[in-house]
């Protein structure tokens, strides 16, 4: 009886077909569809076309439409065309989209608001904004979705002025979707003033709204504004936490990133995902919080996230930066799949841990399996620098061009440091003079340090002028030259440098140290009088000093 109902009633058959497509598979649904003697029913045919769309088999939705037009009396309706325009948008089939638009004209559906909105959205997704605007202008009636489709297209293409103008012209009450889209456009362009104006205008804000603004403030390095919004959020999801944690790491505040990660675990029931782990691991690496890094590694294994290449790469990078190079190597060897970033992290790990030869050997192996990039070559030159391998460093620096890679300022800086450490000061200075970039403060400070090491006052004087222009308040540059003058008993010049330091208000960067105990990272700053436990710290330090004196420890 049920079988008879399915076979004779097209409504029941269509519902059975849709259930079969999702529960059994699209192939089985198509087999049922093809066995049907009458396939030109619009409800049935549209359902089969939509089933292809929902299973992301976009070419098959077009193929079925063409077959139905050739083999049956199927007459497409507005539902057919809205489904097919969406299929075009998602598959980015421009040629199919153009053909479809001509079919829409042919069957007289251009005046249909839903079909025309689909056409506008399709062209906007293709980046063909001229076609999208023409279709929009020809619409006799437009919905809020029509306006949103065109505005979103302009935003994606970076035409924010046109998007903003349309946004202001919208006759409808704007909903949160279009506000979020417009705000996201401003955020991506770095225009946080306009983004904030929209944010303050909104009467209803979603988690996406708040998170978009937080992400924007993190991008422009206004981490305090980002945190104020984060703290003011009425509701947070995992994406919000990930954005704020990542923002701290991105803005060189790793301890705050770790604290927030621990706060998330202590105050919410949210489980970290791969994005959380990828956000917090750089902070762990920067602070040397190895115990927390090991916890992350165990968590990744427990949640089966270690199948993801990016996560494994971040874990091995963390271990290598925390000095656990053997653990890093074990993870690298066990990775079922490696990307260029994985090789780069392992080579750089060897370089950081002073194993230059292992880094270069791995690089040679990498060249058999992967094509090195600029980051690879920086890791290789860094390894040569740490290992004092001047000739190999020169070789790989010059080979970069033959490999089709352009040396960036970081590569030049590493070479200057390598040559300076080796005492090749003339070659290093020539490299600074002839490099296709203006040298930055790091390069000049590195070279000044080499001049100090090899007592080359003349070169130090030349370079200091450039260094002072770039970083007038960096006391380290002055101190190097001042010490050289003192060693040479040039007391007038020594005094002159001191006066320049005073005039430029050069200050010594305050030293700090970090220690991790029970997953908590504590920071100690030289001369800090604001630490909440300073009395206890000073008492313990006093006891330690007394003990060292009693043991006649030579410190």
UniProtKB/Swiss-Prot annotation:
One annotated GO biological process: RNA modification
Q: Where is this region: Type E motif?
A: 443-518
> Could you identify this protein by its name?
Pentatricopeptide repeat-containing protein At2g44880
Q: Name one GO molecular function term.
A: RNA binding
What's the family?
Belongs to the PPR family. PCMP-E subfamily.
Identify the stretches annotated as PPR repeats: 41-75, 77-111, 112-142, 143-173, 175-205, 206-240, 241-267, 273-307, 308-342, 343-370, 373-407, 408-438
UniProt keyword annotations, A-Z: Repeat
A Pfam family per the record = PPR
Q: Where is this region: Type E(+) motif?
A: 519-549
């Amino acid at each position: 009886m049920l079988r008879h109902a399915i076979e004779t009633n097209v409504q029941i058959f269509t519902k059975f077909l849709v259930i079969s497509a999702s529960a059994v598979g699209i192939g089985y649904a198509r087999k049922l569809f093809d066995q049907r003697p009458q396939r030109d029913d619009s409800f049935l045919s549209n359902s089969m076309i939509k089933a292809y769309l929902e299973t992301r088999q976009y070419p098959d939705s077009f193929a079925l439409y063409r077959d139905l037009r050739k083999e049956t009396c199927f007459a497409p309706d507005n539902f057919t065309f809205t489904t097919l325009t969406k299929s075009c948008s998602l598959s980015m089939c421009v040629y199919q989209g153009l053909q479809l638009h001509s079919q829409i004209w042919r069957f007289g559906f251009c005046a249909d608001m839903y079909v025309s909105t689909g056409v506008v959205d399709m062209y906007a997704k293709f980046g063909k904004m001229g076609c999208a605007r023409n279709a929009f202008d020809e619409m006799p009636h437009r919905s809020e979705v029509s306006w949103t489709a065109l505005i979103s297209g302009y935003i994606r293409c970076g035409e924010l002025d046109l998007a903003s103008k349309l946004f202001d012209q919208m006759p409808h009450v704007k909903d949160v979707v279009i506000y979020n889209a417009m705000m996201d456009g401003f955020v991506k362009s770095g225009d946080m003033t306009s983004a904030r104006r929209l944010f303050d205008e909104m009467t209803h804000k979603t988690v996406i709204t708040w998170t978009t603004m937080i992400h924007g403030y993190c991008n422009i390095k206004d981490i305090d504004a980002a945190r104020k919004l984060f703290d003011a959020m009425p509701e947070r999801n995992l994406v919000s936490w990930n954005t704020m944690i990542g923002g701290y790491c991105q803005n060189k505040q790793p301890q705050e990133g770790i604290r927030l990660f621990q706060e998330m675990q202590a105050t919410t029931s949210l489980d970290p995902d791969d994005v959380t782990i990828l956000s917090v691991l750089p902070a762990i690496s920067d602070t040397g919080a190895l115990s927390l890094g090991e916890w992350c590694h165990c968590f990744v294994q427990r949640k089966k996230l270690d199948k993801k290449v990016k996560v494994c790469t971040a874990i091995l990078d963390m271990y290598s930066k925390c000095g656990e190079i053997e653990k890093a190597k074990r993870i690298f060897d066990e990775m079922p799949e490696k990307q260029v970033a994985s090789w780069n992290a392992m080579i750089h790990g060897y370089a950081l841990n002073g194993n230059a030869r292992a880094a270069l050997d791995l690089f040679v192996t990498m060249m058999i399996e992967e094509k090195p990039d600029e980051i690879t070559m920086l890791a290789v030159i860094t390894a040569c620098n740490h290992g004092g391998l001047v000739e190999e460093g020169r070789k790989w620096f010059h080979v970069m061009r033959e490999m089709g890679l352009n040396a960036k300022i970081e590569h030049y800086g590493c070479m200057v440091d390598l040559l300076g450490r080796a005492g090749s000061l003339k070659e290093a200075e020539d490299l600074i003079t002839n490099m296709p970039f203006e040298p930055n403060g790091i390069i000049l400070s590195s070279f000044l340090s080499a001049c100090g090491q090899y007592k080359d006052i003349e070169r130090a004087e030349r370079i200091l002028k450039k260094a002072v222009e770039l970083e007038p308040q960096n006391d380290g540059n002055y101190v190097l030259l001042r010490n050289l003058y003192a060693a040479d008993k040039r007391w007038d010049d020594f005094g002159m440098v001191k006066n320049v330091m005073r005039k430029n208000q050069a200050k010594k960067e305050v030293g700090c140290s970090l220690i991790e105990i029970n997953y908590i990272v504590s920071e100690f700053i030289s001369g800090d009088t604001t630490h909440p436990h300073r009395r206890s710290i000073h008492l313990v330090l006093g006891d330690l000093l007394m003990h060292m004196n009693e043991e006649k420890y030579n410190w």
